[in-house]
Amino acid sequence: MEGLTTLIRNGNRRRTLAVVWLAGVALLALLAPALPLPYPAGVPDLAHVAEAPARASHHWLGTDPQGCDVLSGLLFGARTALLLSLPAALLAALLGGLAGGAAGFWGNRLRMSIPGGGLVAIIVARSVGVPVPALAMGAGVLGMLWAGRRMRRLSATIPVPLDSLVMAAASSLDTVPRLVLVLALAARGGLSVAGLGLVLGLTSWSGPARLVRARMLSISHLPFIEAAQASGLSPARVWWHHALPHALRPLQTALPLSLAALLALESTLSFLGVGLPPDVPSWGLQLAAARQQPQAWWAILFPALILSLTILSFNILTAKRTSPAV
C-alpha cells in the first residue's frame, strides 16, 4: 500500500512538472517578440561565430556555427513549434473525431436521399459530354436540387457505406509512413507555418478517427442512446447531441500524444531542410546548423534538451494512473 501511494505521488509530481514546463514554454513562446533579447533570432553575429556561453558576454547561451544567438533561436523556435503543432493537432482531432464518430454511429447503414432534380442533374452531367463552365454547371445543379426538393418527385435513396469509406481512407493513409508522405508533399515547394500545419493536420487524422470510432461502437447501443432514439429524435440529432460528446473523450488522452508526434515530425523535417523556409526559426534548424561544427556542443545540447523535455512532458501527461496487479 505504501509503495502504491509513493507511485501515485511520484506520478502527480511528474505531471505537475510537465504542466509547469509546458506552460513555461508556451508563455515564453507567446512573449518572445516582446522579450528584451540582445540579438534577434536568425541574424548572424559574424564577430562571434560558434562561441561558447562563457566566452560570449552578450550571447547568454552562445552562438551557433552561423553566428546566430542560441537563446533567441530557442525562444522563437518554441513559438514556431506552438503555432504549428497545436493547430495541426486540433485539425487532426476535429477531422478524425467527426469521421470516426460518423463511421461508428451509422456504420454502413447510412442512406442518402437525392431529390428528383438532383438525380436528373447527376445523370445528365455524367452522360452528356457537352463542355459547360463549372460555375454554370454548379448553378444548374443547385437549381435542379431546389426544384426537385420543392416538387418532391422522382426522389431516390442510395446507400452510403460510410464506415467502409472512412476506414479505407484511414488505412490508405496509414499505408505510407507519415514522414515519407509529408516529405513528398512538403518537397514540392517552400511551405509557410500555416501551410505545413495544414499538411500535418490532414495527414494525421487517421489515429483519432480509429479511437473515436471504437468508442462510438461501444456506446452506440447503450441505454441512454436507445432512449434518445426512442424519444423520436432524428439520428443526426442523437449523434450530435448525445453520442458524439461521449465518443470524443479518448481525444483528451490522444491530443498530447499527437502534439508530441507532430513536434518531433516538424523538427525532423526542419533538420532535413524540408518544410519550413530557412528564415523561420525552428529547433530542428538549430540542430541542423550545429552539424557544421560538432565541437560546438552548446549549439546541439540546448535545442536537443528543450525538444526532448517538451516531448517527454507531453508523454507524461498521457500516462494514466494505474495500480500494480495484486
Give a label for each model feature:
Residues 68, 72-326:
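Alpha-helical transmembrane segments of integral membrane proteins
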Residues 3-12, 57-63, 67-71, 286-290:
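A short amphipathic helical element positioned immediately N-terminal to and/or at the very start
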Residues 7-8, 37-38, 46-50, 211, ...:
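Intrinsically disordered, low-complexity segments enriched in polar/charged residues with Gly/Pro
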Residues 30-72, 273:
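Short membrane-interfacial helix/loop motifs at transmembrane-helix boundaries
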Residues 1-41, 112-123, 166-169, 173:
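N-terminal signal-anchor/first transmembrane alpha helix
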